Amino acid sequence: MLSRSARCSRAVLFSAKRSLASQANTGANASANQVMVSKHVQDIDPEMYDILTKERKRQKHSITLIPSENFTSKSVMDLLGSEMQNKYSEGYPGERYYGGNQFIDMAESLCQKRALELYNLDPQLWGVNVQPLSGAPANLYAYSAVMETNDRLMGLDLPHGGHLSHGYQLPSGTKISYISKYFQTMPYHVDSQTGIIDYDFLSKTSKLFRPKVIVAGASAYSRVLDYKRFKEIADACGAYLMSDMAHISGLVAAGVTRSPFEYSDIVTTTTHKSLRGPRGAMIFYRKGVRKVTKKGKEVLYDLDKRINFSVFPGHQGGPHNHTISALAVALKQAATPEFKEYQAAVVENARIFGEELVKKGFELVSGGTDTHLILINLSNLGIDGARLETLLENINIAANKNTIPGDKSALFPSGLRVGTPAMTTRGFGPQEFAQVAAYIDRAVKLAIGIKSQESPDAKDARSKLASFKELCKESDQVKQLADEVYQWVGEFPVPGEL
């Protein structure tokens, strides 16, 4: 008779052989299609994998200054590439049009719960929809919930720091944003001298225009918003106050800037900027009593059903469950002490970055920043935002040209927009942003010199810019500076490297 240990050894060996045989049979029986869908991208599509590799390298070795960009966490990326994307789930938790959604319901409900908790919102007084695919559609869904076609909307003018999704049309009447086709839109402005929103102008024009919605929000405005004043203005003309905190939602979550929730009826946000989540959006909306009439009658909000219906089935079909699940992870991270420290650093880095730019002779729109964002006025430097953006890209610095008050062209504006969230994520502090300011200063000097060499055959603005781009690629000074930046920034890890 075999000993107990021998019997155990034989059992283990038999089990291992059976497992290997099973795997062999599975492999032998697998169809070509099953084999294909089990391969990694580097095996199935080397061409696309090569592009991915190049983009990873670009991000690693570039200074990312675009304020709306960030580096999301490895754990968020885990969910974005997960099985959560396989499931169709039209509808809402507990009310789906497809079966098999019990875990999808859990994920979406958890995401909603964390969103309300992050901003200290009472679920009896606030609700949130986490299904919008991105920020501009989220704004459209919110407008459509409370307005009919041709109702009136006011938002910050695009050249003054607003966003296309708040409505934009040219002085000639040409409607650039389709929001201005669906609704009647009128902009409000910043004061031309201070660069600060002209609340008195908004108050006067809103009483004449009588909008249904006033949007408090911006994409290129570096100062805190006076939500209390916005609410007073909205109440005076009977409008909903909708705050778009897409750029600052991470700062709001960490308590390092003013929150819109105290005074707003609706709050929208993207989730991938300062919040550092996946590319998505959320719509928060009030519940309960909206106002009390002179006769003492309570008028209740009815935003819950209207906004949820506007999202689905009004505009969207199946939500992106991998994004919602990834957002839930990002919201958990945003509630941590580490995230609060990060956001405090974002604001402090922006302040110091702005001061360093001023020391080098740059003028900042509004004189500085209270947030994560800086808008540089280039109008007195002999270079435009389009050319400076081009040269910066050639030296591995990503920033973006931007209109400033008084600009006539969005293609050749006088501003450059920069911000601190992405590089703060990678470990930049005051010393590093001082170095970035020095790089921008060197870039401006190079750009001015290269501009003077543009081809005399280039007659129109686009041809001149094309000539400038070619000269940038050929410049030895540009190549030397590009290599310097490449080596320096590559020393700072991207998420997932530690």
From Swiss-Prot:
Cell compartment(s), UniProt: Mitochondrion
Point out residues bearing the modification N6-(pyridoxal phosphate)lysine.
K273
**In which pathway does this enzyme or protein participate?**
One-carbon metabolism; tetrahydrofolate interconversion
Q: Which GO terms describe its molecular function?
A: glycine hydroxymethyltransferase activity; pyridoxal phosphate binding
* CDD domains xref list: SHMT (cd00378)
A single Gene Ontology biological process assigned to it is: tetrahydrofolate interconversion
E.C. number, please? 2.1.2.1
Cofactors that this protein relies on? pyridoxal 5'-phosphate
Enzyme class, first EC level, given as a word: transferase
Keyword list, A-Z = Mitochondrion, One-carbon metabolism, Pyridoxal phosphate, Transferase, Transit peptide
Instruction: Give the InterPro entries listed for this entry.
Output: PyrdxlP-dep_Trfase, PyrdxlP-dep_Trfase_major, PyrdxlP-dep_Trfase_small, Ser_HO-MeTrfase, Ser_HO-MeTrfase-like, Ser_HO-MeTrfase_PLP_BS, SHMT-like_dom
Asked if the record carries the keyword Mitochondrion, the reply is yes
- One Pfam family here: SHMT
Q: Which GO terms describe its cellular component?
A: mitochondrion
Query: Which catalysed reactions does the entry list for this protein?
Result: (6R)-5,10-methylene-5,6,7,8-tetrahydrofolate + glycine + H2O = (6S)-5,6,7,8-tetrahydrofolate + L-serine
| NCBIfam families referenced in this protein's UniProt entry, alphabetically | PRK00011.1 (NF000586)
**Function as written in the Swiss-Prot or TrEMBL entry:** Interconversion of serine and glycine.
Q: Which family does it belong to?
A: Belongs to the SHMT family.
Another remark in the UniProt entry says:
In eukaryotes there are two forms of the enzymes: a cytosolic one and a mitochondrial one.
Q: How does it assemble?
A: Homotetramer.
Name of the protein this chain belongs to:
Serine hydroxymethyltransferase, mitochondrial
Species this chain originates from? Kluyveromyces lactis (strain ATCC 8585 / CBS 2359 / DSM 70799 / NBRC 1267 / NRRL Y-1140 / WM37) (Yeast)
Biological classification of the source? Eukaryota, Fungi, Dikarya, Ascomycota, Saccharomycotina
- UniProt lists the gene as SHM1
